[in-house]
Every structure is written in C-alpha cells, then in structure tokens.
Amino acid sequence: MAKQDYYEILGVERGADEKAIKKAYKRLAMKYHPDRTKGDKTSEEKFKEINEAYEILSDKEKRAAYDQYGHAAFEQGGFGGAGAGGFGGGFGGFGGFEDIFSEMFGGGSSRQRVVRGDDLRYDIEITLEEAVRGITKDIQIQTLATCDHCNGSGAEKGSKVETCPTCHGHGRVRRQQGFFMTETTCPHCHGTGKKIEKPCKKCHGDGRVHKTESLSVKIPAGVDTGNQLRLAGKGAAGENGAPAGDLYVVIHVKEHHIFERDGNNLYCEVPISFTQAALGGEIEVPTLDGRAKLKIPEGTQTGTMFRMRGKGITAMRSGYSGDLICKITVETPVKLTDEQKDLLHKLEASLEGKTTQRPKSSSFLDGVKKFFDNLGK
C-alpha cells in the first residue's frame, strides 16, 4: 500500500515553515501519545506515522530530498541509508524531538517539580430564609495543609534535600522505545523530584499533613441550590511550595413548609373559606418580609392565582426582585350542624337555574348534555 504524504499526515501545506510544522506535530503527538491512548493499536500506528513525518520535515536536508524524490529518497540505499522505513532505530536521528517532548511533558529541566494543590468541595445546606437574606456560616473541612514542622520541605531540620539523580528533579522519567517516548513517575523519588536525607517525622517527607481547617463562608443573598462559591487558595496545599487549590462551596437550599421556589419567584397555597370565596374580602398572606394584605374578589374559584409583585427573591447579581404567586384553595366546610346544612340547602335551591351565578357548573352540564346527545345519534 502506498505511503501517505508526510505533509498530509501532519495536516500542513507543502510550503509550511518550521514553526507551523512543529506546532502541528506537537498537537498531533499530544493527541496520539501512547500514554493518552492506552494501548489503542490504531493510535499507536498513527503516532508512528506522525513521528516519521516530523523526522523528515523538521530536517532541512531530508525535507529537500523528500520534496524532490518523495518516499523513494528514504528507501533502501536512499537518504542516510536508514533502511526501508527510513529510520535507523530509536530516537537517535530525530532532531528536535527531545526538545518538543520536553515542552509537552515538562522534561529536561532540573527544577524541582511543583504541583498545585487539589481543589476541594464542600456541600452546605441552608434554609430558604438564609438563602434570601444571605448569611455567614462557619464550616470545617478535611484538607492537606503545609507541614508546620518542616515548613513544607519534607525534611527534618538540618537534613539535606537534593535533586533526585534519576529524574533530575522532574519527578517523571522518559523512556525511548523505537518510535515511542513514554513518561512515567520516577521510581526513585516517587514523583517528588527530590532526595531527602532524613524525612520529616511529622509528614514523612511529603511536606503536607492532613488537617481539619475551620473557615467562615460568607453566603450572599439570593443564592439557590446548585450555586457554587469559590474560595481561592482554600483548597489542599500544593507540593514543593506550589499554590494551594481552591475550595468550592456548593449550596443546597432546604425545602420550605410554606413556599416553593422557582428561580426568583415564590409560590404558596392560600386556603380561604367558602364564604370568603363567594363574598370576597381581604385576607392576610405570608411573605418573606412578614404579613401582607391580599384582596380576594367575589366569586374567586379554587386554583385562581394572584401575583404580588416584588415579594419574591432578589436576584444575586442583577438586584431584580421576583414575585410571590398565591394559589387559592377554597375549603369545603365539614362537620356541619343541621342548621348549617339547612341553610346550604336553601342556598342551593335559590341558585337552581341561575347560570350566571354558577358559570362553571352550567358550562359543565351543558357539555355533558351535548356529549350524551352525540352518543345517541
């Protein structure tokens, strides 16, 4: 099968400069690197092709030969006598590969490896009233803190801390296997990048210790379930003096016994008596600011909703206030006396045939009549 064009493999134009070729190689090598693809044979073959293409196109002489003769320039007896594959083995002839993988994976430097601390999560439950008004809560978190005995060095006082001779402070080691370059945690220093003569007794050389931290968290007014508050630098301590991670406080608002929340609006069910619904009047309803008056028109039915503007929740960022929506439930009287029953019977009799006074009932009965009339046809 004919070999694919090297320029096509890297996805660059034939006139691409060295910078564009290097950039394309870095992107593809990172994508198909064996450490990322975990044994995927197709990706391994792709990685070989990418390395082969870059080995040729990154070298001016080899690229010139390829541009003139194509793949034939590197066949048996061709350019450099590298054999049918065009390579002599290993990465020995790959100019620039060492530098690129150093950039991609942080190798080649004798600097001690620094790793930012982990981000932490804390779930907190608050009441609706606390969510509406805002509150400061004291919390305790389990975290990794800088060891106060060795100040994070991991070494006992007076003990030497040297750069790991195996990984030269990188914390990881690279191995070349044909076209592949793999990187693993240094087996000598276990990724710390350093060699400690006498490890700290308290943290055992890690430089960090498990600790319970107490914090005050200011929760702003208007938060809702699922909102996250980020406390920068309040996560786990970093390794070797690296910055600490962040703490994310996740809000959970408890269900309320009166109100239901939908965004910045509040909903509540308001029961009224049979006579209040029929005659109308003014009732008291609960709001987050206390009691408020609500006017009930004559003839109010169950399910009617009244909107009280601005009586909802004030948004955290915009300052816009939602509404309170009151849903009316008309209560049917129970355990009536004989006298009360007699009065209701008289009322029922007086309403007989008065369609304007019982609009829903009349409409329903008309609909039922039409339904049965149609069945009989």
UniProtKB/Swiss-Prot annotation:
Q: Where are the zinc fingers (CR-type)?
A: 134-212
Q: Where in the cell is it found?
A: Cytoplasm
Q: Which GO terms describe its molecular function?
A: ATP binding; heat shock protein binding; unfolded protein binding; zinc ion binding
The J domain covers: 5-70
Alphabetized, the UniProt keywords read: Chaperone, Cytoplasm, DNA replication, Metal-binding, Repeat, Stress response, Zinc, Zinc-finger
Could you tell me the Gene Ontology terms of the biological process aspect for this record?
A: chaperone cofactor-dependent protein refolding; DNA replication; protein refolding; response to heat
| Cofactor comment text | Binds 2 Zn(2+) ions per monomer.
What are the binding positions for Zn(2+) 1 in this chain?
147, 150, 200, 203
Is Cell division a UniProt keyword of this protein?
no
Q: Where are the CXXCXGXG motif repeats?
A: 147-154, 164-171, 186-193, 200-207
Concerning InterPro entries, the annotation shows: DnaJ, DnaJ_C, DnaJ_domain, DnaJ_domain_CS, HSP40/DnaJ_pept-bd, HSP_DnaJ_Cys-rich_dom, HSP_DnaJ_Cys-rich_dom_sf, J_dom_sf
Q: Where is this protein primarily located?
A: cytoplasm
| Highest taxon of source | Bacteria
Matches recorded under Gene3D superfamilies: DnaJ domain, Heat shock protein DnaJ, cysteine-rich domain, Urease metallochaperone UreE, N-terminal domain
Q: Which GO terms describe its cellular component?
A: cytoplasm
- Which positions in this protein are listed as binding Zn(2+) 2? 164, 167, 186, 189
Q: Which cofactor does it need?
A: Zn(2+)
Q: Is Cytoplasm there in the keyword field? A: yes
Which Pfam family, any one, appears in the UniProt record? DnaJ_CXXCXGXG
Domain remarks in the Swiss-Prot or TrEMBL record? The J domain is necessary and sufficient to stimulate DnaK ATPase activity. Zinc center 1 plays an important role in the autonomous, DnaK-independent chaperone activity of DnaJ. Zinc center 2 is essential for interaction with DnaK and for DnaJ activity.
Record text on subunit structure and interactions: Homodimer.
**Recorded family membership:** Belongs to the DnaJ family.
What's this protein's function?
A: Participates actively in the response to hyperosmotic and heat shock by preventing the aggregation of stress-denatured proteins and by disaggregating proteins, also in an autonomous, DnaK-independent fashion. Unfolded proteins bind initially to DnaJ; upon interaction with the DnaJ-bound protein, DnaK hydrolyzes its bound ATP, resulting in the formation of a stable complex. GrpE releases ADP from DnaK; ATP binding to DnaK triggers the release of the substrate protein, thus completing the reaction cycle.
Protein name in the entry: Chaperone protein DnaJ
- Give the organism the record lists: Actinobacillus succinogenes (strain ATCC 55618 / DSM 22257 / CCUG 43843 / 130Z)
Traced from the root, the source organism's taxonomic lineage reads:
Bacteria, Pseudomonadati, Pseudomonadota, Gammaproteobacteria, Pasteurellales
Gene designation per UniProt: dnaJ
